[in-house]
A protein has these predicted regions:
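Rossmann-like dinucleotide-binding domain for NAD(H)/NADP(H)
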Residues: 15-16, 101, 149-268, 304-305, ...
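Phosphate-binding beta-alpha-beta segment of Rossmann-like dinucleotide-binding domains, i.e.
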Residues: 11, 18-67, 79-86, 235
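A conserved regulatory-domain signal marking ACT and ACT-like small-molecule sensing domains
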Residues: 241-243, 247-453
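Rossmann-like dinucleotide/phosphate-binding beta-alpha-beta segment
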Residues: 56-148
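Short beta->alpha connector loops at strand-helix junctions that form conserved
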Residues: 12-24, 95, 114, 156, ...
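Glycine-rich adenosine-cofactor-binding loop
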Residues: 19, 64-85, 253-260, 383-392
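Rossmann-fold NAD(P) dinucleotide-binding segment
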Residues: 1-7, 132-152, 163-167
Length: 453
């Protein structure tokens, strides 16, 4: 938010951040808001300052034995869980990526989906980055299934809780309260939440403690010292995507793997349970650490606000209990080299295979057993469909109607199963109307838009 990263990159200036320094401060602020809501601290304080003694009006609630639902079990979410256990709260947790191994050890009950949290929680606190998956994660439909006694807390990013839906719920007394430390636009032009006694608003104070600022400064200084001494460049926002002087073909495969990871992060929704990669052909005889890391970067990036790189990705993956099962086979004859990745989630299992042709041309050559060939660049629409005539023409017609140019198209079939798929590389990102229209075609079973660059 404070540095023009693209300009710094153009000038050759390395930019680094310190994501861990404010973890405790953000978690403590979350607990402060939970406590303040539960005991009506803010309205009671304002009332007494106004000369009114209203002890009965501001009777509160205990945290003891209440259910706290935490959405996002990263560093801050886990810190909140540990603190809340000190108040004897029952913790339910859900993470869109994967629950960290330590979560259950500290007493967090891992939920399979968000509905469990929405229906059973007395308090719901969000600790996820803002992205396409989490924007408006909590809206009117989600609030409808919550307890009337629920209280919502957002110390993460504005927009994760839909503000219109939250306002309507507070106005109708559909929920017991809310606490907001973040807003879609800061400072917020909209002051409507200030009218509710049961809604606490603070000006993005999550990381605003003296101790957090010292921690951030110390971490920044240590990162700088390490970099100057030639050590690993930690938390770099604009570092090169590969490390060391790898062979050119390895660099190409690292980029291919990143794009395959990005594709799988879209077509394999759900919490990650298992990750496997396979190297075949001559690439299996080369140093491929950067390729596996490139794959993880693509797979995990949308779940983190900080840019992932070759230094921080393995650490962040380990924190979430994600590891790669890697196999190599140099003795193959069907293709010179290939990289294949398989991701198992709680909802689906997907496999994508790619190869580098001519040393520079990145290609996807197989998706879930469908043999195809498509260039993994820009936006790629992946469609799983019934195998019937007219599919290609119908897809092309819809794209043409929305002035979308098809760059490459891969088509795969499984005649015995009467199933097929298309992978369509586009010259621009399709708008929602085009995707909706494609999804309504009678032969389409699943459709995904993968952003690979």
């Amino acid at each position: 938010d404070n540095i023009d990263v693209p300009t710094a990159t153009r000038k050759g200036i390395l930019v680094m951040n310190t994501p861990g320094g404010n973890t405790l401060s953000a978690a403590e602020h979350t607990m402060a808001l939970i406590l303040a809501m539960s005991r009506n601290v803010v309205p009671a304080c304002n009332s007494l300052k106004g000369g009114i003694w209203e002890k009965k009006k501001y009777m509160g609630n205990q945290l003891n034995n209440k259910v706290l639902g935490i959405i996002g079990l990263g560093r801050i979410g886990m810190a909140v869980a540990r603190m809340a256990k000190g108040f004897n709260m029952n913790i339910m947790g859900y993470d869109p990526l994967a629950a960290p191994p330590d979560a259950e050890k500290i007493g967090v009950r891992i939920c399979k989906d968000l509905d469990e949290i929405f229906k059973q929680s007395d308090y719901i606190s969000v600790h996820v980055p803002k992205n396409e998956q989490t924007l408006n994660m909590i809206g009117a439909e989600q609030i409808k299934v919550m307890k009337p006694s629920v209280r919502l807390i957002n110390c993460a990013r504005g927009g994760i809780i839909n503000e219109d839906a939250l306002y309507e719920a507070l106005a109708a007394r559909r929920i017991a309260g809310a606490a907001l430390d973040v807003f879609p636009k800061e400072p917020p032009e909209d002051k409507r939440f200030t009218i509710f006694e049961n809604c606490i608003v603070t000006p993005h104070l999550g990381a605003s403690t003296e101790e957090a600022q010292v921690e951030v400064a110390v971490e920044a200084a240590q990162i700088l010292v390490d970099a100057i001494k030639g050590g690993p460049v930690r938390n770099a926002l604009n570092a090169p995507s590969t490390m060391g002087a790898a062979p050119a073909i390895v660099t190409q495969y690292a980029e291919l793997a990143r794009r395959i990871g990005a594709m799988l992060s879209t077509i394999a929704p759900g919490q990650i349970q298992k990750v496997q990669v396979r190297y075949r052909g001559s690439i299996a005889e080369m140093p491929v650490e950067s390729v596996s890391l490139g794959f993880l970067i693509g797979l995990l990036q949308k779940h983190f606000e900080m840019p992932l790189n070759m230094v921080n990705t393995s650490v962040l993956a380990k924190e979430r209990g994600i590891s790669i099962d890697e196999t190599k086979n140099a003795e193959v004859k069907d293709v010179a080299s290939s990289f294949s990745a398989r991701v198992v989630t709680d909802k689906v299992t997907r496999t994508v295979t790619g190869s580098v042709f001519g040393g520079t041309r990145l290609r996807i050559i197989e998706i879930d057993g469908f043999n195809i060939e498509v260039t993994p660049q820009g936006s790629v629409i992946v469609i799983f469909n019934d195998d019937k005539p007219g599919v290609i023409g119908s897809v092309g017609t819809v794209c043409g109607r929305y002035n979308i140019n098809i760059c490459t198209m891969g088509v795969g079939q499984k005649p015995a199963e009467q199933k097929a798929m298309l992978a369509v590389s586009l010259d621009k990102e399709p708008d929602e109307k085009a995707v909706d229209e494609l999804g309504k075609l009678d032969f389409v079973n699943e459709i995904y838009v993968c952003k690979l660059n």
